[in-house]
Protein backbone atom coordinates (compact mmCIF):
# COMPACT_ATOMS: atom_id res chain seq x y z
CA UNK A 1 0.00 0.00 0.00
CA UNK A 2 2.68 2.43 1.01
CA UNK A 3 4.95 1.58 -1.92
CA UNK A 4 2.58 3.02 -4.53
CA UNK A 5 1.18 6.30 -3.17
CA UNK A 6 0.50 7.59 -6.69
CA UNK A 7 -1.89 4.71 -7.38
CA UNK A 8 -3.60 5.21 -4.02
CA UNK A 9 -4.01 8.92 -4.65
CA UNK A 10 -5.40 8.30 -8.14
CA UNK A 11 -7.99 5.91 -6.73
CA UNK A 12 -8.78 8.38 -3.96
CA UNK A 13 -9.33 11.23 -6.41
CA UNK A 14 -11.61 9.01 -8.50
CA UNK A 15 -13.57 8.07 -5.39
CA UNK A 16 -13.87 11.68 -4.26
CA UNK A 17 -15.20 12.72 -7.66
CA UNK A 18 -17.78 9.94 -7.53
CA UNK A 19 -18.97 10.94 -4.07
CA UNK A 20 -18.99 14.61 -5.04
CA UNK A 21 -21.42 13.70 -7.82
CA UNK A 22 -23.60 11.88 -5.28
CA UNK A 23 -23.35 14.84 -2.89
CA UNK A 24 -21.55 12.90 -0.15
CA UNK A 25 -17.87 13.22 0.70
CA UNK A 26 -15.31 14.60 3.14
CA UNK A 27 -14.21 18.05 2.00
CA UNK A 28 -12.35 19.21 5.10
CA UNK A 29 -9.83 17.60 7.47
CA UNK A 30 -8.98 19.02 10.88
CA UNK A 31 -5.57 17.66 11.90
CA UNK A 32 -4.25 17.42 15.43
CA UNK A 33 -0.48 17.92 15.63
CA UNK A 34 1.16 16.36 18.69
CA UNK A 35 0.96 12.59 18.57
CA UNK A 36 -0.80 12.68 15.20
CA UNK A 37 1.22 14.48 12.53
CA UNK A 38 4.35 14.82 14.66
CA UNK A 39 5.86 12.50 17.27
CA UNK A 40 5.36 14.48 20.47
CA UNK A 41 7.07 11.99 22.78
CA UNK A 42 10.31 12.22 20.79
CA UNK A 43 10.25 16.02 20.98
CA UNK A 44 9.33 15.96 24.66
CA UNK A 45 12.20 13.64 25.54
CA UNK A 46 14.79 15.60 23.56
CA UNK A 47 13.67 18.93 25.03
CA UNK A 48 13.70 17.79 28.65
CA UNK A 49 17.03 15.99 28.35
CA UNK A 50 18.59 19.04 26.72
CA UNK A 51 17.37 21.34 29.50
CA UNK A 52 18.46 18.93 32.24
CA UNK A 53 21.94 19.18 30.77
CA UNK A 54 21.76 22.98 30.45
CA UNK A 55 20.64 23.40 34.08
CA UNK A 56 23.03 20.72 35.38
CA UNK A 57 20.19 18.71 36.88
CA UNK A 58 21.86 15.35 36.44
CA UNK A 59 21.01 12.52 34.09
CA UNK A 60 17.48 12.54 32.73
CA UNK A 61 16.72 8.85 32.38
CA UNK A 62 13.87 7.24 30.48
CA UNK A 63 12.30 6.48 33.86
CA UNK A 64 12.28 10.18 34.74
CA UNK A 65 10.79 11.05 31.36
CA UNK A 66 8.05 8.46 31.95
CA UNK A 67 7.25 9.96 35.36
CA UNK A 68 7.05 13.43 33.85
CA UNK A 69 4.85 12.23 30.98
CA UNK A 70 2.38 10.73 33.43
CA UNK A 71 2.19 13.98 35.41
CA UNK A 72 1.92 16.00 32.21
CA UNK A 73 -0.88 13.86 30.82
CA UNK A 74 -2.88 14.26 34.03
CA UNK A 75 -2.61 18.03 33.87
CA UNK A 76 -3.64 18.21 30.21
CA UNK A 77 -6.72 16.12 31.01
CA UNK A 78 -7.61 18.63 33.73
CA UNK A 79 -7.24 21.40 31.17
CA UNK A 80 -9.61 19.59 28.81
CA UNK A 81 -12.16 19.30 31.63
CA UNK A 82 -11.88 23.02 32.29
CA UNK A 83 -10.49 22.55 35.81
CA UNK A 84 -7.30 24.55 35.21
CA UNK A 85 -6.05 27.18 32.78
CA UNK A 86 -3.20 26.57 30.38
CA UNK A 87 -0.75 28.90 32.21
CA UNK A 88 -1.50 26.96 35.39
CA UNK A 89 -0.87 23.51 33.95
CA UNK A 90 2.29 24.49 32.07
CA UNK A 91 4.07 25.48 35.27
CA UNK A 92 2.41 23.20 37.82
CA UNK A 93 3.31 20.04 35.91
CA UNK A 94 7.00 20.90 36.21
CA UNK A 95 6.63 21.94 39.86
CA UNK A 96 5.17 18.52 40.64
CA UNK A 97 7.78 16.73 38.57
CA UNK A 98 10.69 18.65 40.11
CA UNK A 99 9.35 18.05 43.62
CA UNK A 100 9.23 14.31 42.93
CA UNK A 101 12.83 14.38 41.67
CA UNK A 102 14.28 16.51 44.49
CA UNK A 103 14.72 19.57 42.24
CA UNK A 104 13.82 23.10 43.34
CA UNK A 105 10.18 23.60 42.21
CA UNK A 106 10.78 27.34 41.87
CA UNK A 107 12.71 26.57 38.68
CA UNK A 108 9.48 25.41 37.01
CA UNK A 109 8.37 28.67 35.37
CA UNK A 110 11.75 29.45 33.81
CA UNK A 111 12.22 25.82 32.77
CA UNK A 112 8.83 25.78 31.05
CA UNK A 113 9.60 28.90 29.01
CA UNK A 114 12.74 27.32 27.60
CA UNK A 115 10.98 23.99 27.20
CA UNK A 116 8.36 25.53 24.88
CA UNK A 117 11.13 26.75 22.57
CA UNK A 118 13.05 23.47 22.69
CA UNK A 119 9.94 21.43 21.83
CA UNK A 120 10.12 22.73 18.29
CA UNK A 121 13.73 21.69 17.77
CA UNK A 122 13.01 17.98 17.29
CA UNK A 123 10.89 17.07 14.26
CA UNK A 124 9.86 13.44 13.87
CA UNK A 125 7.01 12.73 11.47
CA UNK A 126 4.36 10.15 12.25
CA UNK A 127 3.96 7.74 9.33
CA UNK A 128 5.33 10.04 6.64
CA UNK A 129 2.72 12.64 7.60
CA UNK A 130 4.36 15.43 5.60
CA UNK A 131 3.91 13.63 2.29
CA UNK A 132 0.41 12.49 3.21
CA UNK A 133 -0.67 16.07 3.91
CA UNK A 134 1.10 17.20 0.74
CA UNK A 135 -0.68 14.57 -1.38
CA UNK A 136 -4.07 15.78 -0.13
CA UNK A 137 -3.46 19.41 -1.04
CA UNK A 138 -6.08 20.64 -3.47
CA UNK A 139 -8.23 17.55 -2.86
CA UNK A 140 -9.55 18.52 0.56
CA UNK A 141 -9.18 21.57 2.77
CA UNK A 142 -6.75 20.91 5.64
CA UNK A 143 -6.46 22.76 8.93
CA UNK A 144 -4.42 22.34 12.10
CA UNK A 145 -6.42 22.29 15.34
CA UNK A 146 -4.15 22.15 18.39
CA UNK A 147 -4.09 22.83 22.12
CA UNK A 148 -0.31 23.22 21.98
CA UNK A 149 1.28 26.54 22.85
CA UNK A 150 1.79 29.17 20.18
CA UNK A 151 5.55 29.21 20.79
CA UNK A 152 6.00 25.46 20.40
CA UNK A 153 3.51 24.85 17.59
CA UNK A 154 4.56 27.79 15.44
CA UNK A 155 8.14 26.54 15.47
CA UNK A 156 7.16 22.92 14.85
CA UNK A 157 4.89 23.75 11.95
CA UNK A 158 7.52 25.98 10.36
CA UNK A 159 10.47 23.61 10.70
CA UNK A 160 8.45 20.53 9.73
CA UNK A 161 7.07 22.18 6.60
CA UNK A 162 3.55 21.14 7.58
CA UNK A 163 2.35 24.63 8.38
CA UNK A 164 2.79 25.94 4.85
CA UNK A 165 0.74 23.05 3.46
CA UNK A 166 -2.29 23.86 5.59
CA UNK A 167 -5.22 26.04 4.60
CA UNK A 168 -5.22 27.42 8.13
CA UNK A 169 -3.87 26.90 11.64
CA UNK A 170 -6.02 27.14 14.76
CA UNK A 171 -4.25 27.18 18.12
CA UNK A 172 -6.16 27.26 21.38
CA UNK A 173 -4.08 30.12 22.79
CA UNK A 174 -5.06 32.30 19.84
CA UNK A 175 -8.71 31.30 20.11
CA UNK A 176 -8.70 31.55 23.92
CA UNK A 177 -10.57 28.25 23.97
CA UNK A 178 -9.41 24.65 24.28
CA UNK A 179 -10.36 21.40 22.61
CA UNK A 180 -12.72 19.65 23.26
CA UNK A 181 -14.80 22.72 24.13
CA UNK A 182 -17.50 23.75 21.67
CA UNK A 183 -16.23 27.35 21.72
CA UNK A 184 -12.98 26.18 20.09
CA UNK A 185 -14.82 24.57 17.18
CA UNK A 186 -17.35 27.38 16.88
CA UNK A 187 -14.48 29.76 16.19
CA UNK A 188 -12.86 27.32 13.75
CA UNK A 189 -16.04 26.99 11.69
CA UNK A 190 -16.65 30.72 11.78
CA UNK A 191 -13.17 31.26 10.33
CA UNK A 192 -13.24 28.60 7.60
CA UNK A 193 -16.66 29.60 6.33
CA UNK A 194 -19.74 27.60 5.33
CA UNK A 195 -19.20 23.85 5.37
CA UNK A 196 -21.52 20.95 6.08
CA UNK A 197 -20.64 19.24 9.35
CA UNK A 198 -20.96 15.80 7.76
CA UNK A 199 -18.23 16.77 5.29
CA UNK A 200 -15.69 17.51 8.03
CA UNK A 201 -13.34 14.92 9.56
CA UNK A 202 -11.14 15.44 12.60
CA UNK A 203 -8.07 13.18 12.85
CA UNK A 204 -6.30 12.93 16.19
CA UNK A 205 -4.75 10.66 18.78
CA UNK A 206 -6.67 11.90 21.82
CA UNK A 207 -10.09 10.50 22.65
CA UNK A 208 -10.68 13.17 25.29
CA UNK A 209 -9.56 16.13 23.21
CA UNK A 210 -9.84 15.42 19.47
CA UNK A 211 -12.60 12.83 19.35
CA UNK A 212 -14.72 14.34 22.12
CA UNK A 213 -14.26 17.72 20.47
CA UNK A 214 -15.41 16.27 17.18
CA UNK A 215 -18.48 14.82 18.90
CA UNK A 216 -19.28 18.20 20.43
CA UNK A 217 -18.94 19.83 17.01
CA UNK A 218 -21.09 17.22 15.28
CA UNK A 219 -18.42 16.21 12.75
CA UNK A 220 -16.89 12.88 11.66
CA UNK A 221 -14.14 11.50 13.89
CA UNK A 222 -11.04 9.45 13.12
CA UNK A 223 -9.00 8.17 16.05
CA UNK A 224 -5.32 7.66 15.24
CA UNK A 225 -4.16 4.90 17.58
CA UNK A 226 -1.13 2.89 16.39
CA UNK A 227 -1.87 0.21 18.99
CA UNK A 228 -5.17 -0.58 17.30
CA UNK A 229 -8.82 -0.23 18.18
CA UNK A 230 -9.49 -0.33 21.93
CA UNK A 231 -13.19 -0.45 22.72
CA UNK A 232 -12.52 -0.28 26.45
CA UNK A 233 -10.71 3.03 26.07
CA UNK A 234 -13.47 4.35 23.82
CA UNK A 235 -16.15 3.30 26.29
CA UNK A 236 -14.30 4.78 29.25
CA UNK A 237 -13.88 8.07 27.39
CA UNK A 238 -17.58 8.07 26.56
CA UNK A 239 -17.07 9.14 22.96
CA UNK A 240 -18.33 8.15 19.51
CA UNK A 241 -15.57 7.11 17.11
CA UNK A 242 -16.42 6.83 13.43
CA UNK A 243 -13.09 5.43 12.24
CA UNK A 244 -9.94 4.01 13.86
CA UNK A 245 -6.60 3.99 12.05
CA UNK A 246 -3.25 2.57 13.12
CA UNK A 247 -1.26 4.30 10.38
CA UNK A 248 -1.86 7.72 8.83
CA UNK A 249 -1.80 6.19 5.35
CA UNK A 250 -5.19 4.70 6.25
CA UNK A 251 -6.65 8.20 5.97
CA UNK A 252 -6.87 7.52 2.22
CA UNK A 253 -9.16 4.57 2.95
CA UNK A 254 -11.25 6.63 5.34
CA UNK A 255 -11.72 9.39 2.78
CA UNK A 256 -12.72 6.84 0.16
CA UNK A 257 -15.21 5.25 2.55
CA UNK A 258 -16.96 8.26 4.09
Language model features with spans:
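Asp-based, Mg2+/Mn2+-dependent phosphohydrolase catalytic module
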Residues: 3, 7-29, 42, 134, ...
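N-terminal helical cap/lid subdomain that shapes the substrate entry/recognition surface
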Residues: 26-127
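Secondary-structure boundary/capping positions in well-ordered alpha/beta enzyme cores
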Residues: 58, 104, 139-140, 195-198
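Residue-level marker of alpha-helix boundaries and capping positions
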Residues: 85, 123, 144, 201-202
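Short glycine/proline-enriched coil/turn segments at helix->beta-strand junctions
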Residues: 99, 138-140, 219
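Short, flexible loop segments at the rims of nucleotide/cofactor-binding pockets, characterized by
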Residues: 119-123, 147-148, 223
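Catalytic-core regions built around general acid/base machinery
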Residues: 128-139
Amino acid sequence: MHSCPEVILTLLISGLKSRRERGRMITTILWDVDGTLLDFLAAEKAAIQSLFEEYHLGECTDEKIARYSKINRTYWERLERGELTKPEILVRRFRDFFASEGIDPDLAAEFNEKYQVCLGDTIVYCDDSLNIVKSLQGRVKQYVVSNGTVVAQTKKLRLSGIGELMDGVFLSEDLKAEKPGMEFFTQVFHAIGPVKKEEVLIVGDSLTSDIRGGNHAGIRTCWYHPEGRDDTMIQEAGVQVDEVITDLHEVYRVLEKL
